C-alpha cells in the first residue's frame, strides 16, 4: 500500500539506553494519520458495499534489543510490538454515520479501550475502532564467517490473538548470511500461517460489566465489521502481501476474502562474478 499521510515522532534506529553499559537498545515510533482514499474506494466498491471514509489512523511501535555493542558477545535478542488502529471517519451506512473522533476518543484508541456512549454497540462492547498488531521476536548469532537469525512475527486482531489463543499464527523465518562465499551470500526461509485465528467461529463470554458479551475466535485477519475496507489504504493491504489485497477482487468486494493461508517463501542471493549478481525468490501459496 501507499504510505498513509501522518505525523510521526520516532526513534528510527536502535539507540543505547543509558546506564546499561551499551547492552540495551530501544527504538519506536508514535503516529497519527488520516486516509485520503475515498475516491479509490468509491470507484471500486459494488453498490451493496458500505464503508467508512476519511478514516483516522493511529500507529505506535516499541522494540527492545539486547546486544553487546562492543561485539564481544555473539548472541543478540530483540522483542517488539506494533499496533495500528482505525477510528473516526464517516460510514456510508446511515445506521452508523459519523464515528467518534474527539481527543478523548483518541486516548481510548491509543489505550485500546472501549468506546463511549456515542460509539456503536460493538465498539462499546469491545474496543473503539479497528485494531491490528504484531509481536516481534528475533534471535541472532553472529560469527566472523557470517550470521544466523531466527525470527517470529505473531499476528493479532483482538484480545484473543494478544493472549496467543490463535496458536502459531504469524510469520516464522530464518536467515543465514555467509561471509567470504561470493556465489551464495544469503539464504532466507519463511513460513506464514494464518489458519488458526483463535478458532473457526466467534464465541462470546457473558461477563462484560455493561453489555452481555465479549469474546474472540474467528479473528478474520485484516477485516473488520464496521471499517469494512480493513487493514488497507487505497484498497491495498498494509500488512503481509500474502493476504491478497481487496483490489484483486473481481466483484467490488472491499474485504479480504482469502485470509486463512499456509505459505512458504524462499530466497537466496549471491554474485557469480564481479559484474554479475543474482537474487532468487520463490513463494508457494496455499490459501
Language-model region placement:
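Flexible, solvent-exposed coil segments and beta strand-coil junctions
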Residues: 1, 31-34, 40-45, 114-120, ...
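Outer-membrane beta-barrel translocator domains and adjoining extracellular loop/strand segments
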Residues: 38-48, 90-94, 161-165, 199-204
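Sequence/structural signature of outer-membrane beta-barrel proteins
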Residues: 1, 16, 33-40, 44, ...
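Outer-membrane beta-barrel pore domains
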Residues: 122-287
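A conserved mid-domain beta-alpha-beta active-site/ligand-binding segment of alpha/beta enzyme cores
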Residues: 52, 56-60, 64-139
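Short loop/turn motifs that connect adjacent beta-strands in outer-membrane beta-barrel proteins
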Residues: 14-28, 65-78, 141-147, 178-184, ...
Amino acid at each position: 500500500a501507499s504510505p498513509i499521510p501522518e505525523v510521526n515522532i520516532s526513534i528510527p534506529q536502535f539507540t543505547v539506553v543509558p546506564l546499561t553499559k551499551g547492552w540495551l537498545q530501544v527504538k519506536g515510533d508514535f503516529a497519527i494519520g488520516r486516509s485520503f482514499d475515498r475516491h479509490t474506494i468509491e470507484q471500486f466498491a459494488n453498490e451493496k458495499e458500505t464503508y467508512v471514509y476519511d478514516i483516522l489512523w493511529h500507529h505506535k511501535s516499541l522494540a527492545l534489543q539486547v546486544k553487546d555493542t562492543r561485539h564481544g558477545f555473539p548472541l543478540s535478542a530483540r522483542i517488539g510490538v506494533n499496533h495500528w488502529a482505525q477510528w473516526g471517519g464517516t460510514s456510508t451506512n446511515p445506521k452508523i454515520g459519523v464515528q467518534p473522533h474527539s481527543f478523548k476518543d483518541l486516548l481510548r484508541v491509543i489505550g485500546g479501550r472501549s468506546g463511549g456512549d456515542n460509539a456503536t454497540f460493538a465498539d462499546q462492547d469491545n474496543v473503539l475502532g479497528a485494531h491490528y498488531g504484531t509481536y516481534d521476536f528475533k534471535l541472532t548469532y553472529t560469527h566472523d564467517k557470517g550470521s544466523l537469525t531466527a525470527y517470529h512475527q505473531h499476528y493479532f486482531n483482538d484480545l484473543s490473538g494478544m493472549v496467543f489463543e490463535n496458536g502459531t499464527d504469524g510469520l516464522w523465518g530464518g536467515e543465514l548470511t555467509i561471509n567470504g562465499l561470493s556465489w551464495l551470500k544469503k539464504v532466507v526461509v519463511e513460513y506464514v500461517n494464518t489458519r488458526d485465528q483463535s478458532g473457526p467461529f466467534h464465541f462470546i463470554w457473558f461477563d462484560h460489566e455493561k453489555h452481555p458479551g465479549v469474546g474472540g475466535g474467528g479473528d478474520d485477519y485484516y477485516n473488520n465489521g464496521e471499517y469494512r475496507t480493513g487493514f488497507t489504504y487505497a484498497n491495498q493491504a498494509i500488512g503481509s502481501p500474502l493476504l491478497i489485497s481487496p483490489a484483486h477482487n473481481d466483484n467490488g468486494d472491499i474485504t479480504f476474502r482469502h485470509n486463512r493461508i499456509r505459505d512458504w517463501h524462499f530466497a537466496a542471493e549471491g554474485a557469480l562474478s564481479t559484474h554479475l549478481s543474482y537474487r532468487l525468490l520463490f513463494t508457494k501459496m496455499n490459501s
